[in-house]
Amino acid sequence: VIEQWRKALVLAPHTDDGEFGCGGTMTRLVDAGCDVRYVAFSIATRSLPPGFPPDTLAREVEEATAELGIPAESLTVHDLDVRTFPQRRQDILELLVALWEEWAPDVVFQPSLHDVHQDHRTVAEEGLRAFKRTTILGYEIPWNNFDFAYQWYVALEEHHIERKIAALERYASQQHRRYANAEYVRNLARTHGVNVNREYAEVFQVYRVVA
């Protein structure tokens, strides 16, 4: 099914959210010839560990998405302050509406509506408003999802997971986080894969399917 999508949009409130939520799926889509665009809304300057320059995450997301096969011209990085998205709701909506009017993606990958991070939830809510005429899937961020009932599995193979892990390892500034762990990423994908008799999988909440 996903090989029929020609244009896919990934919404990442902060750099690396998209890679964690659907990095394997992005590689599968790229391999199938899909035009994948990645939009990050914040480089989380105020959350960087000491010693890293302010533009660190802007550079790291470019390296990470390149690992997934996404060219630099398909990456857009905004610089909204972290944890202020609810106050910037209208600005975010206008950015998303402009994307719809300019590009009209076949599918949008975004955070879950059940994500407890205020920035993630704002992007999810405004994504539903901006892209209500196309397919919308909510990706999994387990440490932020208190309620994540998923209905859509994307089966993945070893090389998809290897590229997802390689992308996440480009975030040198985030390697101190417990979830930035290759074993964790692989085992989560393996667990989802076992549930559908595949080697690996990523899972999504379905908000709208337009076929």
Predicted regions and their residues:
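Residues at the C-termini of beta-strands that transition into short coil/loop
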Residues: 40-42, 79-81, 140-142, 157, ...
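A short acidic, often aromatic-flanked loop/helix-cap motif at beta-alpha or helix-coil junctions
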Residues: 82-86, 144-146, 160-161
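Short, basic/aromatic-enriched C-terminal tail that caps enzymatic domains
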Residues: 197-211
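Surface-exposed helix-capping loop/turn segments at secondary-structure junctions
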Residues: 72, 175-176
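Short clusters of hydrophobic/aromatic residues that line enzyme substrate/ligand-binding pockets
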Residues: 85, 154, 204
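Short, flexible loop segments at boundaries between secondary-structure elements
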Residues: 134-155
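A conserved mid-domain beta-alpha-beta active-site/ligand-binding segment of alpha/beta enzyme cores
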Residues: 154-174, 180-190
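Active-site beta-strand->loop->alpha-helix modules in alpha/beta enzyme cores, enriched
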Residues: 1-135, 184, 188-199
